[in-house]
Amino acid sequence: GRGVPVSRLLTTSVPHVHALGDCAEVDGQWLPYVMPLMQQTRALAATLAGKPTPVAYPVMPVVVKTPAWPTVVCPPPADAAGQWEVTSSDDALEARFVSASSAEQAGALLGFVLQGKAVSQRQAWVAQVSA
């Protein structure tokens, strides 16, 4: 692992000790970004206030802000079965990771990469992953 192993309640193996942010690995996922930290903070605040609240993440693409070649990455789940389908042109790249698993609807969008002019489609792709 890359962080302190914690449950969805952000509890460690030591009673009354919690971890969040860059140092926490929630159910095997290490997410050193601002949006996961915000979700973790809300969940932990509720838990510490007496209402046990597991952290739940929305679809959270990572935006790499480079003027020459902007990039948005929404990685598929680590254990997802599927394949990448890539299309590109001189000014854009679209890569989609689609499900091949019978447990999920075959062909469902599980992750993506958008680059160049394709980054303008981020919200539409996030909605497809959320569906």
Give the predicted meaning of each segment.
Residues 26, 50-54, 80, 121:
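Flexible, glycine-rich phosphate/dinucleotide-binding loops
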Residues 6, 60-75:
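Central beta-strand plus flanking loop segment that forms part of the substrate or channel wall
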Residues 3, 59-61, 92-94:
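Short, acidic/polar N-cap/turn motifs at the starts of alpha helices
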Residues 69-131:
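C-terminal catalytic lobe of FAD-dependent flavoproteins
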Residues 53-66, 84-89:
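Short catalytic/ligand-gating loop segments at beta-alpha or beta-beta junctions
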Residues 34-61:
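Internal hydrophobic alpha-helix adjacent to the cofactor/substrate pocket in enzyme cavities
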